[in-house]
């Protein structure tokens, strides 16, 4: 039930705060436009992680305005953070009541963050939560598939924001 409320609040918050953005949003939207047009000379850079811009590209190909594409990417980032955080809570073995509390806190706080920013922070945090949830598994070292999945998730987090390195 909390995820339904979270998604509804995130969507409502996104629609009601379309014109609000931070300064980084302009850079990410511009880089997404470079990726969507195949201008790799400007798209590839050493400062901005590509993942958030990549999430915007399919929307740009469909003719969506860059600001809406950025907000939709943030909606996806909020979902990744929500589910990644719950995966981590489950992985460390907290009780069901603790998981429900975390789910409701996330459902009520994520919309406020994602509606005012176009930034990879939620995306990288969600991917890191997924990676940490995999890493705390008792069979992490014994299960090659889990170890590779953990490494791949950390790699995706790095593509979202270099701080994950």
Residue ranges: model-predicted function:
Residues 48, 52, 56-64, 70-84, ...:
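Transmembrane alpha-helices of multi-pass, membrane-embedded glycan-processing enzymes
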Residues 83-108, 125-126, 144-146:
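Transmembrane-helix signature of polytopic, membrane-embedded enzymes
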Residues 148, 152-165:
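Transmembrane helices and adjacent periplasmic/lumenal helix-loop junctions
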Residues 3, 99-109, 129, 133, ...:
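Short helix- or helix-capping micro-motifs
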Residues 15-31, 43-55, 64-65:
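Extracytoplasmic catalytic/substrate-binding loops of multi-pass membrane glycan-assembly enzymes
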Residues 91-95, 129-147, 157:
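Membrane-interface transmembrane helices that cradle and orient dolichyl/undecaprenyl
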Residues 1-22, 107-109, 157:
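Transmembrane signal-anchor helices characteristic of membrane glycosylation enzymes that use polyprenol
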Residues 48, 113-124:
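Short acidic/glycine- and proline-prone juxtamembrane loop motifs at membrane-interface regions
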